């Protein structure tokens, strides 16, 4: 995480697990252990923000239940309780938490950490987290809901991460569709700056073309999607990007 921060990453997709019915485990991605806990992550964030107080960090977070394929299943409600206890007791989060507001800007985030949870951690007023609906659809443009202490807002999500989510298509069709969706959501967001700034957008370039357990599957997607997104942004500079 510290290396990613130094290279310019400011948004993180963290997926904590459970070691038992009451204790948070490490952050995983699917069945892969990152070796980092939520406490570790907060330490990395705090250290970075101390030396870069003008920066802010966004964490998109959800319970990585897929780890439970490797061990007995632990209910989401147990995770919610454990995570709320962690947020309540973690001194770093309590000192750096950014209260969600649908119209917040970077000014409100500087020196702080905003958590957007894909699991409802109500009451959100206790922890200042935001809760968002999510989508893995192979279409974009549907407005979902995001809410917290700062009210209810709209959010647009593009997170089609596999051929399975594209109707079990071929790898080539998935890669083509992924590029199309990334660029389409970029285009949809342009008018927001002028007409309605109270919209949130999460546009994932990540995904895999092939087996979820093969590193080259992710490399294939990155080699296809990342240049397409960059070229689209460069071609539209000055139009809201």
Language-model features: where?
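Catalytic cores of phosphodiester-bond hydrolases, prominently lipid phosphodiesterases
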Residues: 1-10, 17-241
């Amino acid at each position: 995480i510290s290396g990613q921060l130094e290279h310019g990453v400011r948004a993180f997709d963290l997926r904590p697990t459970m070691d038992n019915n009451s204790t948070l485990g490490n952050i995983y991605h699917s069945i892969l252990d990152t070796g980092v806990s939520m406490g570790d992550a907060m330490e990395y964030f705090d250290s970075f923000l101390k030396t870069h107080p003008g920066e802010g960090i966004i964490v998109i977070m959800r319970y990585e239940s897929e780890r439970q394929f490797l061990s007995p299943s632990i209910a989401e409600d147990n995770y919610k309780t454990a995570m709320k206890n962690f947020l309540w007791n973690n001194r770093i989060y309590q000192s750096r938490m950014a209260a969600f507001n649908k119209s917040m800007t970077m000014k409100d985030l500087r020196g702080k950490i905003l958590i957007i949870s894909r699991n409802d951690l109500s009451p959100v007023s206790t922890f200042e987290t935001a809760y968002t609906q999510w989508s893995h659809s192979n279409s974009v443009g549907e407005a979902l809901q995001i809410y917290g202490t700062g009210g209810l807002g709209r959010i647009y999500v593009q997170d089609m991460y596999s051929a399975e989510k594209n109707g079990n298509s071929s790898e080539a069709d998935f890669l083509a569709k992924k590029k199309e969706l990334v660029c389409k959501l970029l285009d949809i967001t342009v008018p927001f700056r002028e007409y309605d700034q109270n919209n949130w957008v999460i546009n994932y370039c990540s995904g895999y073309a092939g087996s979820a357990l093969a590193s080259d599957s992710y490399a294939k997607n990155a080699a296809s999607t990342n240049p397409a997104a960059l070229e689209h942004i460069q071609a539209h500079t000055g139009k809201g990007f």
